[in-house]
């Protein structure tokens, strides 16, 4: 019977050795209306171009745009819908964290993940290190958010 030292991940379907280098996955499409973006920003990022449609018209964006924090939260939700079955132990940070274009109200976005690196842990044989490249794009293939993320993933041990 297979087991892992990371009991919370016992129900996960994909462990380190199940992950295929260069595998890609895509989320469903998602869009949010202006009201949802404003409600979030009022609580967590109350800058005028996130919360006030009239003042936002004079911003560099010319309209309401989603908070980067909101965009990141939506990315995480979409990513977990396609990669939530991985036996994650911990994320180790984010590299090249960018928001090259704003997330606009009622604009469909999609998250993609690409496994660009994987290796067994040098310190602990019960885990591996992976690096995913993540990107959120709109329907015109414009990049809304991107980053790379190293993370530890459980390995199945006997």
Language model regions located:
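HotDog/MaoC-like acyl-thioester-processing domains
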Residues: 2-21, 99-108, 112-158
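Hot-dog-fold acyl-thioester-processing enzymes
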Residues: 2-93, 158
């Amino acid at each position: 019977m297979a087991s892992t030292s990371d009991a919370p991940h016992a129900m996960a379907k994909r462990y380190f050795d199940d992950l295929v280098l260069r595998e890609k996955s895509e989320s469903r499409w998602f869009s949010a209306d202006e009201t949802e973006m404003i409600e979030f920003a009022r609580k967590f990022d109350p800058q005028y171009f996130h919360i006030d449609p009239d003042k936002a018209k004079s911003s560099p964006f010319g309209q309401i745009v989603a908070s980067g924090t909101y965009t990141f939260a939506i990315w995480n939700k979409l990513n977990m819908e396609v990669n939530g079955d991985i036996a994650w132990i911990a994320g180790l940070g984010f590299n090249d964290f960018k928001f090259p274009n704003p997330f606009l109200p009622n604009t469909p976005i999609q998250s993609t993940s690409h496994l660009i690196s994987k290796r067994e842990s040098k310190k602990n044989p019960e885990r591996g290190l992976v690096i995913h490249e993540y990107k959120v794009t709109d329907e015109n293939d414009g990049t809304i958010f991107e980053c790379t993320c190293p993370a530890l993933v459980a390995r199945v041990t006997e």
